[in-house]
């Protein structure tokens, strides 16, 4: 068996380097290099490095040292690697110094052109060199880096370091100044070759090599931009600030108007954004925008805010949108605009209501229409110009709450009714909308109007007052079958429930249910008691109302004529048989009926209240009565009888024997008789409308009287719920929770809450903790 001796190679370093230097000259002159020549250079580097290693390893083996299967780290190998690394560095340094010397004589745009051209050539040539010395990169340089040796770089990085130390550091001030001057020229309207700037920017980014740290240790993104930011971006932002500070000052000192200024700022911001995309590094986008915004917007906020109110008055929505977008770009830029908007909307709302105050006080439709016109105008503005920004939405809400709850219309009401007037008018508008009429809107329009009503309803502070008025009017629509549409009624209840919760509409839903049950009950009654009623009985429909769900109605006693009393008596028997233990209380004040009359020149069908029917039927017995006689015959009291007779006189069905001061204030001694000359174009005449107007006035008075007492009950119940859950609560926390829980229904006054707490302590629902007067305890 024969031993094969390792191939022994020797290389003269001077010969090898001469060959490599010639190849580098070709690369740095940007001459074509054939692939074969490139591979020859690469192989020369490889052979030179490995030949020294192999030779040294052979000698070590002959001296009896252990042989290794991998090339050993030897002093000879270190020397060769370091020698070649130094020669590469010296070659590049000589090349760069020559380039620098030529550029030192240039300035301005000529310098930028020269610099970018030479840099691009240098970068490409250095990439070629990096490939030629790839073996050096992978072995000696990599080993040096792994062992933590400083000031050692991969060949391409070495080229960048040499460029930075020997060219950039000498020319940087002139180059950066030339860049800034070129950018300034573009800002003033000149055409420039942006490639000169982008080329230098690319160079600065590539020069992001930290001399003090190895390539392996660097945070690539942060360190990569270090040169760019330190030497260019800082000065660029400073120049930008100075340029736009002067431009803004010149514009405003020459009397420029706010619209032109905003357009100019928009244009400049767009130009700077384009500039960044075209020839600056993307990392500059944010600081550049911040710089421009600071100078052009933040420093001019007073000027912009001062003109905001005028733009609102002139309804220049496009300019308002422009101002919003600009001010939104800077910290706290919108704060004053929000305040101005709130004040302006509140002022507009109050002025609009002042213009219609006299008519709107009694015209619910006009009142709500005026509120909506103001709100819709500014809701549209907030949507389109202010992009529904939450702060501007809040400004609209605050302003709307202000002028909807307290305005010129509400101030025309009596003092005790001012707080409830807005809620009352909104409820009356709902009643008009949902009540049968000759001009009822179609289904789609009704849905749209209901949605608009909910806009106003949202801002009503006293939603409990609205509920009282609405419930009263809703009950009358149901009782008198005056609803325009069952579906529309149900739809509106759903909207109220969606905004205020189930509890708010529970009574309304129960009322609807009662009417449905009553229809079935009436049909069952007519079927089962047909024989008792007989063929000559009156047409009869009944509503059985749950006492806890419906508003409280006056139960004025009255003596019914025999035609009615018999039917009512039979129904009472039927109901007691069906529901044993329940008690019926007849509410004649809310009952209606129809009377066919032939006492006049033509036949009429009158719709009348129970009291009106009883009064009119008396005239079947004789031609005239005193009011006192009518009261005695019907068992009406001295307050009700004159009012009922007065309503019939006002409708011209009856006439008094003497002239009355007021038709609704008929003295008990007055004599009245049928007005046999009564004429009306309509055959069907509703006599109950007059009493309905009287009821409306009375309802308003009753709601106003009951609001405070009802609120005390609600507040007390809320306090008990909180105490029952918490057991022990601090005074301020209890106050806060009560206000929070009830704010959806009304705004409870602090004094009223305190009185309710005191009352509950007296009733022993709760007590003040001994020694801690601001702490309450619940008593089971």
UniProtKB/Swiss-Prot annotation:
The entry's note on the tissues where this protein occurs is: Ubiquitous.
Report keywords, A-Z: Cell cycle, Cell division, Cytoplasm, Isopeptide bond, Ubl conjugation, Ubl conjugation pathway
Q: Does the keyword Cell division apply?
A: yes
Pfam families in UniProt: Cullin, Cullin_Nedd8
Q: Where is the protein localized? A: Cytoplasm
In terms of SUPFAM superfamilies, this protein maps to: Cullin homology domain (SSF75632), Cullin repeat-like (SSF74788), Winged helix' DNA-binding domain (SSF46785)
**The keyword Cell cycle belongs to this UniProt entry's keyword annotation:** yes
Which InterPro entries did the record assign?
Cullin (IPR045093), Cullin_CS (IPR016157), Cullin_homology (IPR016158), Cullin_homology_sf (IPR036317), Cullin_N (IPR001373), Cullin_neddylation_domain (IPR019559), Cullin_repeat-like_dom_sf (IPR016159), WH-like_DNA-bd_sf (IPR036388)
Give the SMART domains listed for this entry.
Answer: CULLIN (SM00182), Cullin_Nedd8 (SM00884)
Q: Pathway involvement?
A: Protein modification; protein ubiquitination
Where does cross-link Glycyl lysine isopeptide (Lys-Gly) (interchain with G-Cter in NEDD8) occur? 724
Which Gene3D superfamilies does this chain map to?
Cullin Repeats (1.20.1310.10), Cullin, Chain C, Domain 2 (3.30.230.130), Winged helix-like DNA-binding domain superfamily/Winged helix DNA-binding domain (1.10.10.10)
Annotated Cullin neddylation domain ranges read 710-771
- Recount the PTM note: Neddylated; which enhances the ubiquitination activity of SCF.
| PROSITE patterns according to UniProt | CULLIN_1 (PS01256), CULLIN_2 (PS50069)
GO function terms (MF aspect) = protein-macromolecule adaptor activity; ubiquitin protein ligase binding
| Gene Ontology CC entries for this record | cytoplasm; SCF ubiquitin ligase complex
Q: Per the UniProt entry, what is one GO biological process?
A: regulation of cell size
Family per similarity comment: Belongs to the cullin family.
* Assembly and binders: Component of an SCF (SKP1-CUL1-F-box protein) E3 ubiquitin ligase complex composed of cul-1, fsn-1, rpm-1 and skr-1. Interacts with Skp1-related proteins skr-1, skr-2, skr-3, skr-4, skr-7, skr-8, skr-9 and skr-10.
Q: What's this protein's function?
A: Probable core component of multiple cullin-RING-based SCF (SKP1-CUL1-F-box) E3 ubiquitin-protein ligase complexes which mediate the ubiquitination and subsequent proteasomal degradation of target proteins. As a scaffold protein may contribute to catalysis through positioning of the substrate and the ubiquitin-conjugating enzyme. Required for developmentally programmed transitions from the G1 phase of the cell cycle to the G0 phase or the apoptotic pathway.
Q: What is this protein called?
A: Cullin-1
Organism, per UniProt? Answer: Caenorhabditis elegans
